[in-house]
Protein backbone atom coordinates (compact mmCIF):
# COMPACT_ATOMS: atom_id res chain seq x y z
CA UNK A 1 0.00 0.00 0.00
CA UNK A 2 1.46 3.37 -1.02
CA UNK A 3 1.26 6.66 0.91
CA UNK A 4 -1.75 7.90 -1.09
CA UNK A 5 -3.76 4.76 -0.28
CA UNK A 6 -2.80 5.03 3.39
CA UNK A 7 -4.02 8.63 3.58
CA UNK A 8 -7.21 7.81 1.67
CA UNK A 9 -8.02 4.91 4.01
CA UNK A 10 -7.25 6.98 7.12
CA UNK A 11 -9.25 10.12 6.37
CA UNK A 12 -13.01 9.70 6.70
CA UNK A 13 -14.69 11.00 3.51
CA UNK A 14 -17.15 13.90 3.53
CA UNK A 15 -20.56 13.36 1.97
CA UNK A 16 -21.18 15.51 -1.10
CA UNK A 17 -24.17 17.14 0.64
CA UNK A 18 -21.65 18.82 2.93
CA UNK A 19 -19.31 20.25 0.30
CA UNK A 20 -21.10 23.60 0.00
CA UNK A 21 -21.27 24.01 3.79
CA UNK A 22 -17.59 23.20 4.33
CA UNK A 23 -16.64 25.59 1.51
CA UNK A 24 -18.85 28.34 2.97
CA UNK A 25 -17.31 27.94 6.42
CA UNK A 26 -13.80 28.07 4.96
CA UNK A 27 -14.50 31.20 2.90
CA UNK A 28 -16.02 32.84 5.96
CA UNK A 29 -12.85 31.94 7.88
CA UNK A 30 -10.73 33.71 5.27
CA UNK A 31 -12.91 36.82 5.44
CA UNK A 32 -12.83 36.86 9.24
CA UNK A 33 -9.06 36.34 9.16
CA UNK A 34 -8.72 39.42 6.96
CA UNK A 35 -10.56 41.41 9.65
CA UNK A 36 -8.65 39.93 12.58
CA UNK A 37 -6.22 37.01 12.49
CA UNK A 38 -7.55 35.22 15.62
CA UNK A 39 -10.97 35.02 13.97
CA UNK A 40 -9.45 32.97 11.15
CA UNK A 41 -8.47 30.24 13.58
CA UNK A 42 -11.91 30.28 15.17
CA UNK A 43 -13.44 29.93 11.71
CA UNK A 44 -11.03 27.12 10.85
CA UNK A 45 -12.13 25.16 13.91
CA UNK A 46 -15.77 25.62 12.88
CA UNK A 47 -14.88 24.50 9.34
CA UNK A 48 -13.31 21.34 10.75
CA UNK A 49 -16.43 20.71 12.84
CA UNK A 50 -18.63 21.13 9.75
CA UNK A 51 -16.50 18.62 7.84
CA UNK A 52 -16.76 16.24 10.80
CA UNK A 53 -20.55 16.60 10.87
CA UNK A 54 -20.86 15.62 7.19
CA UNK A 55 -18.47 12.66 7.50
CA UNK A 56 -19.55 9.53 5.64
CA UNK A 57 -17.61 6.52 6.95
CA UNK A 58 -17.83 3.08 5.40
CA UNK A 59 -19.82 0.53 7.39
CA UNK A 60 -19.93 -3.28 7.32
CA UNK A 61 -23.62 -4.22 7.23
CA UNK A 62 -24.91 -7.72 8.10
CA UNK A 63 -26.66 -9.11 5.02
CA UNK A 64 -29.39 -11.15 6.68
CA UNK A 65 -33.07 -10.74 5.78
CA UNK A 66 -34.02 -11.75 9.33
CA UNK A 67 -32.35 -8.61 10.75
CA UNK A 68 -33.32 -4.95 10.90
CA UNK A 69 -30.25 -2.72 11.10
CA UNK A 70 -30.08 0.78 12.55
CA UNK A 71 -30.58 3.45 9.86
CA UNK A 72 -28.85 6.11 11.97
CA UNK A 73 -26.00 6.79 14.36
CA UNK A 74 -27.22 7.90 17.76
CA UNK A 75 -28.93 6.81 20.94
CA UNK A 76 -31.96 4.56 21.19
CA UNK A 77 -34.48 6.94 22.79
CA UNK A 78 -37.64 4.81 22.72
CA UNK A 79 -38.90 1.27 22.09
CA UNK A 80 -42.70 1.26 22.20
CA UNK A 81 -45.87 0.16 20.44
CA UNK A 82 -47.66 2.99 18.58
CA UNK A 83 -49.88 3.51 15.56
CA UNK A 84 -47.69 4.42 12.55
CA UNK A 85 -48.18 7.78 10.77
CA UNK A 86 -51.11 7.75 8.37
CA UNK A 87 -48.99 8.77 5.38
CA UNK A 88 -47.03 5.51 5.60
CA UNK A 89 -50.23 3.58 4.84
CA UNK A 90 -49.24 0.78 7.21
CA UNK A 91 -52.69 0.49 8.77
CA UNK A 92 -54.22 1.61 12.05
CA UNK A 93 -52.95 -1.18 14.28
CA UNK A 94 -50.05 -0.42 16.66
CA UNK A 95 -46.56 -1.44 15.55
CA UNK A 96 -43.34 -1.61 17.53
CA UNK A 97 -41.42 1.62 16.97
CA UNK A 98 -37.72 2.01 17.71
CA UNK A 99 -36.52 5.63 17.82
CA UNK A 100 -32.87 6.64 17.36
CA UNK A 101 -31.96 10.21 18.32
CA UNK A 102 -29.03 11.88 16.55
CA UNK A 103 -27.28 14.82 18.19
CA UNK A 104 -25.09 17.33 16.33
CA UNK A 105 -21.98 15.19 16.88
CA UNK A 106 -23.38 12.02 15.29
CA UNK A 107 -22.88 11.07 11.65
CA UNK A 108 -26.13 12.10 9.94
CA UNK A 109 -26.06 9.93 6.82
CA UNK A 110 -29.08 7.60 6.95
CA UNK A 111 -28.95 3.99 5.72
CA UNK A 112 -31.61 1.48 4.73
CA UNK A 113 -32.34 -0.87 7.65
CA UNK A 114 -33.30 -3.81 5.39
CA UNK A 115 -33.09 -5.13 1.86
CA UNK A 116 -36.23 -4.71 -0.18
CA UNK A 117 -38.18 -2.42 -2.48
CA UNK A 118 -39.33 1.12 -1.77
CA UNK A 119 -43.14 1.17 -2.02
CA UNK A 120 -43.91 4.56 -0.49
CA UNK A 121 -42.14 7.88 0.12
CA UNK A 122 -44.19 10.55 1.88
CA UNK A 123 -43.05 14.02 3.01
CA UNK A 124 -45.03 15.96 5.63
CA UNK A 125 -44.25 19.58 6.62
CA UNK A 126 -44.42 20.46 10.30
CA UNK A 127 -42.80 22.06 13.34
CA UNK A 128 -39.23 21.87 14.62
CA UNK A 129 -39.64 20.72 18.22
CA UNK A 130 -36.94 18.91 20.17
CA UNK A 131 -36.65 15.60 18.29
CA UNK A 132 -36.26 13.65 21.56
CA UNK A 133 -39.78 14.43 22.80
CA UNK A 134 -42.59 12.06 21.84
CA UNK A 135 -44.71 14.84 20.28
CA UNK A 136 -42.02 15.29 17.61
CA UNK A 137 -43.26 12.12 15.90
CA UNK A 138 -46.64 13.75 15.33
CA UNK A 139 -45.90 17.47 14.95
CA UNK A 140 -42.44 17.85 13.42
CA UNK A 141 -41.48 18.00 9.76
CA UNK A 142 -40.83 14.46 8.60
CA UNK A 143 -40.22 12.22 5.63
CA UNK A 144 -41.36 8.62 5.69
CA UNK A 145 -40.58 5.67 3.50
CA UNK A 146 -41.84 2.10 3.45
CA UNK A 147 -39.67 -0.82 2.38
CA UNK A 148 -41.33 -4.07 1.34
CA UNK A 149 -39.34 -7.12 2.43
CA UNK A 150 -39.80 -10.88 2.53
CA UNK A 151 -41.10 -10.48 6.11
CA UNK A 152 -43.48 -7.58 5.52
CA UNK A 153 -43.27 -3.81 5.28
CA UNK A 154 -40.77 -1.80 7.33
CA UNK A 155 -41.48 1.88 7.97
CA UNK A 156 -38.68 4.44 8.36
CA UNK A 157 -39.38 8.06 9.29
CA UNK A 158 -36.82 10.89 9.17
CA UNK A 159 -37.84 13.55 11.71
CA UNK A 160 -36.42 17.08 11.80
CA UNK A 161 -35.46 18.66 15.15
CA UNK A 162 -34.89 22.11 16.63
CA UNK A 163 -31.60 22.57 14.78
CA UNK A 164 -32.26 20.29 11.82
CA UNK A 165 -34.15 22.22 9.13
CA UNK A 166 -33.45 20.12 6.07
CA UNK A 167 -34.43 16.52 5.40
CA UNK A 168 -32.80 14.93 2.36
CA UNK A 169 -34.06 11.67 0.82
CA UNK A 170 -32.61 10.20 -2.38
CA UNK A 171 -34.82 7.15 -2.94
CA UNK A 172 -38.09 6.92 -4.87
CA UNK A 173 -40.95 4.40 -5.03
CA UNK A 174 -40.24 1.12 -6.86
CA UNK A 175 -36.48 1.42 -6.36
CA UNK A 176 -34.63 -1.54 -4.78
CA UNK A 177 -32.42 -0.96 -1.74
CA UNK A 178 -29.87 -3.06 0.09
CA UNK A 179 -29.44 -3.12 3.85
CA UNK A 180 -26.90 -0.45 4.75
CA UNK A 181 -27.39 1.50 1.52
CA UNK A 182 -27.39 5.28 1.97
CA UNK A 183 -30.85 6.72 1.39
CA UNK A 184 -30.82 10.17 2.97
CA UNK A 185 -29.48 12.69 5.44
CA UNK A 186 -30.81 15.15 8.02
CA UNK A 187 -28.77 18.25 8.78
CA UNK A 188 -27.79 19.19 12.32
CA UNK A 189 -29.60 17.02 14.89
CA UNK A 190 -32.71 14.91 14.40
CA UNK A 191 -34.33 11.49 14.83
CA UNK A 192 -35.18 8.28 12.95
CA UNK A 193 -38.22 6.13 13.77
CA UNK A 194 -38.30 2.51 12.58
CA UNK A 195 -41.60 0.59 12.52
CA UNK A 196 -41.25 -3.19 12.75
CA UNK A 197 -43.57 -5.62 10.94
CA UNK A 198 -45.13 -8.50 12.87
CA UNK A 199 -42.68 -11.24 13.78
CA UNK A 200 -39.71 -8.97 14.56
CA UNK A 201 -38.52 -8.60 18.15
CA UNK A 202 -36.41 -5.64 19.37
CA UNK A 203 -32.84 -6.47 20.34
CA UNK A 204 -31.87 -3.07 21.72
CA UNK A 205 -32.85 -1.13 24.82
CA UNK A 206 -33.37 2.56 25.59
CA UNK A 207 -30.09 4.42 26.10
CA UNK A 208 -28.04 2.08 23.93
CA UNK A 209 -25.75 3.51 21.28
CA UNK A 210 -26.67 2.60 17.70
CA UNK A 211 -24.33 2.59 14.70
CA UNK A 212 -25.94 3.14 11.29
CA UNK A 213 -25.54 0.16 9.00
CA UNK A 214 -24.14 -2.08 11.76
CA UNK A 215 -26.20 -2.26 14.97
CA UNK A 216 -28.95 -4.90 14.94
CA UNK A 217 -32.19 -3.28 16.13
CA UNK A 218 -34.51 -6.27 15.71
CA UNK A 219 -34.54 -9.88 14.58
CA UNK A 220 -37.30 -11.96 13.02
CA UNK A 221 -38.65 -14.51 15.47
CA UNK A 222 -36.03 -13.58 18.05
CA UNK A 223 -36.52 -13.93 21.77
CA UNK A 224 -32.86 -13.53 22.67
CA UNK A 225 -33.05 -10.04 24.20
CA UNK A 226 -30.92 -6.99 23.43
CA UNK A 227 -27.76 -7.15 21.36
CA UNK A 228 -25.07 -4.81 22.67
CA UNK A 229 -23.68 -2.54 19.95
CA UNK A 230 -20.16 -1.26 19.93
CA UNK A 231 -19.76 2.33 21.06
CA UNK A 232 -17.83 4.93 19.14
From Swiss-Prot:
PTM comment, free text: Is synthesized initially as an inactive proenzyme. Formation of the active enzyme involves a self-maturation process in which the active site pyruvoyl group is generated from an internal serine residue via an autocatalytic post-translational modification. Two non-identical subunits are generated from the proenzyme in this reaction, and the pyruvate is formed at the N-terminus of the alpha chain, which is derived from the carboxyl end of the proenzyme.
Signal peptide: none
Active-site residues annotated for this sequence: 190 (schiff-base intermediate with substrate)
Topology term for the membrane: Peripheral membrane protein
InterPro entries tied to this protein: PS_Dcarbxylase (IPR003817), PSD-A (IPR033175)
Residues modified to Pyruvic acid (Ser): 190
Cofactors: pyruvate
Molecular function per GO: phosphatidylserine decarboxylase activity
Places the protein is found: Cell membrane
Assembly and binders: Heterodimer of a large membrane-associated beta subunit and a small pyruvoyl-containing alpha subunit.
Similarity comment: Belongs to the phosphatidylserine decarboxylase family. PSD-A subfamily.
HAMAP family linked to this entry: PS_decarb_PSD_A (MF_00664)
Function: Catalyzes the formation of phosphatidylethanolamine (PtdEtn) from phosphatidylserine (PtdSer).
Protein name, entry field: Phosphatidylserine decarboxylase proenzyme
Organism (species): Agrobacterium fabrum (strain C58 / ATCC 33970) (Agrobacterium tumefaciens (strain C58))
Amino acid sequence: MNLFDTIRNTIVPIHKEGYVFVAAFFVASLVLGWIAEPLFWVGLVLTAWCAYFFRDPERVTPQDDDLIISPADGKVSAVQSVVPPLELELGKEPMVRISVFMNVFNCHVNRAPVRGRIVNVAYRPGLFLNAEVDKASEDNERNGLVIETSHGKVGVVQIAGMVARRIVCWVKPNEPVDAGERFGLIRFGSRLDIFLPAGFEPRVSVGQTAIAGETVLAEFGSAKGPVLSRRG
